[in-house]
């Protein structure tokens, strides 16, 4: 899939995320929008994960450690055909499997998450199992930056480098906001590159809302032999809608009718602009 097609998918995904959160009157809007492009590129270009390979022992594994942003994951899994898009309209409704954090009851989800700090330890275990079993699969996990205050992240990181897990890809959604404010005000996170490098990771930076940059970076995996891979993905919380971007209130704010209509209008305008850019480029 080329970068223009990926960019169009990101816009479509954001529309779905807003729609299902509005319908459920619940959800984590900002963090779902910040990681949309990451999940888009992983599932559509990088990982060997599909409904057809769901039971293959050599499929890649994905663990969504920042489980509160599950609306983004549900949206991508529906698009990939793990379940019908219409099922997402039951989000957070009584009796639905589509609850506010990932569970293995939903097709395509490998691990229950939501208790922050647990996704990376599980991903490390999966990657170690692949090494011990002689399997070729890779393990990907996306963490929130606020999640890095959890001690289990650093315990797991020691293990990842000790066991030389170059089949592990850890992505930090570095949007600099968490539920109560700026990450730096809650717990200092300066020098993240140096910290992760000291724990033995091969660290790379990327614009986490640029599908082309993400595609180029993931094509370089593994970054260094015998080292776990760490991607500091610099993102904007609420990416794609001007009045949602970089606003702490949108951590789990549900859009009003007017906000929803305005957000969809902005995304549709972005769609038109992208289409116009693509047509202009093709005519040169």
Predicted segments with their positions:
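Structured core elements
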Residues: 63, 169, 205, 230-232
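Short, active-site-adjacent cap segments at secondary-structure transitions
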Residues: 71, 148-149, 177-178, 237-242
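N-terminal hydrophobic or amphipathic helices/low-complexity stretches enriched
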Residues: 1-13
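Thiamine diphosphate
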Residues: 108, 112-115, 120-223
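Short acidic, glycine/serine/threonine-rich loops at helix termini
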Residues: 74-75, 103, 152-154, 180-184, ...
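Glycine/aspartate-rich loop-and-adjacent alpha/beta segment that forms the canonical ThDP
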Residues: 211-284
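N-terminal capping segment at the start of a domain
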Residues: 10-26, 173-175
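Cofactor-binding active-site loop characterized by glycine-rich and histidine/acidic residues
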Residues: 17-20, 32-162
